[in-house]
């Protein structure tokens, strides 16, 4: 019989959590126009008895609260969120984070620290699953994968390792322990696509030498309407059906599922066209419009992933995007890092 160590399973009672939920839901309703898609009925899956690990690519700090509101307002339980401890500093903020169901993932600097962090994450994930607590994680571990390399980062396998172990051992866990819930575990891939990334300039290190990492509290100064956000929850993957796979194979599989959920928005098309035009030394609008048509044509096999297109006419599309994002109004080579950021979000479709 496996006896779990007594752990502090984060509680959601009290003023702090209720206030955080209220503010998050208010921002979700008033500072975005969210479009949510479910490829399967997650509410029904929860009712049938399951514990879920939500995983997806990390683009913006908005996801750490916005995804929770998307689930909460669709009558799904709010998951515990994993967040790098480099984003929250100070005893007060750490306490507030824990009271709002955030668990901190240590960002190790040395090899030893990284190994210890992985062990702690694995142990926490195992306990959350055993206590029936849904979790939301970003296995990339950073928002700077795209701005630094032009590609989405790989998924760290540690959290998936915990789920594999849980599924193999769950029937041997002492169920007499208070709060233990032995449920079927699922991994739910998700993706969040933005018509405007609120911290885009900071992510690409605009007017600086390299990208810088924003602290979570810096996001308060970025309170702005980010317009259309497209959230997609993919088909849940039942972990017990993949026990023959290694944790790395699971990580690769889930990453591929997340890539397939990426939507193509007008801003991505215009950005890709601008990047190609400016890299070829062409900044006249006629060349840019022609390139927009070319990009749309090359994406024809993925039209089922187009979202937010009211008009495919290049000039109309460019005007719509430039009204939302100032850097697009007067295309110039010095703004290429911004254009490339939005273009690279759909780069895997253009290969």
Locations of regions flagged by a protein language model:
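Membrane-interfacial terminal anchoring regions of lipid-handling membrane enzymes
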Residues: 1-351
């Amino acid at each position: 019989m496996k006896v779990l160590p007594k752990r502090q399973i984060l509680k959601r009672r009290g003023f702090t959590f209720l206030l955080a939920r209220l503010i998050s839901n208010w921002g979700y309703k008033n500072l975005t126009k969210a479009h949510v898609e479910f490829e399967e009925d997650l509410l029904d899956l929860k009712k049938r008895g399951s514990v879920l690990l939500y995983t997806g690519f990390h683009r913006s700090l908005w996801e750490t609260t916005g995804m929770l509101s998307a689930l909460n307002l669709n009558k799904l339980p709010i998951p515990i969120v994993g967040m790098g401890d480099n984003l929250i500093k100070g005893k007060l903020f750490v306490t507030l984070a824990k009271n709002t169901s955030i668990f901190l993932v240590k960002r190790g600097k040395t090899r030893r620290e990284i190994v210890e962090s992985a062990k702690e994450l694995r142990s926490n994930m195992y306990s959350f699953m055993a206590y029936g607590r849904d979790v939301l994680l970003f296995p990339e571990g950073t928002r700077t994968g795209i701005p630094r390399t032009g590609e989405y980062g790989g998924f760290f396998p540690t959290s998936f390792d915990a789920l594999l172990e849980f599924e193999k051992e769950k029937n041997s866990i002492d169920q007499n322990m208070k709060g233990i819930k032995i449920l079927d575990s699922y991994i739910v891939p998700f993706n969040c696509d933005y018509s405007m990334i609120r911290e885009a300039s900071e992510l690409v290190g605009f007017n600086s030498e390299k990208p810088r990492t924003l602290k979570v509290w810096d996001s308060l100064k970025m309170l702005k309407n980010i317009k259309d956000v497209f959230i997609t929850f993919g088909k849940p993957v039942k972990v017990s059906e993949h026990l023959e796979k290694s944790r790395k194979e699971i990580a690769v599989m889930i990453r591929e599922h997340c890539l397939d959920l990426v939507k193509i928005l007008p801003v991505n098309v215009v950005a890709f066209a601008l990047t190609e035009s400016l890299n070829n030394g062409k900044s006249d609008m006629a060349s840019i419009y022609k390139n927009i048509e070319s990009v749309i044509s090359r994406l024809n096999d993925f039209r089922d992933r187009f979202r937010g297109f009211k008009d495919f006419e290049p000039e109309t599309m460019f005007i719509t995007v430039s009204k939302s994002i100032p850097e697009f109004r007067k295309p110039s080579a010095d703004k290429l890092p911004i254009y490339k950021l939005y273009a690279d979000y759909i780069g895997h479709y253009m290969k």
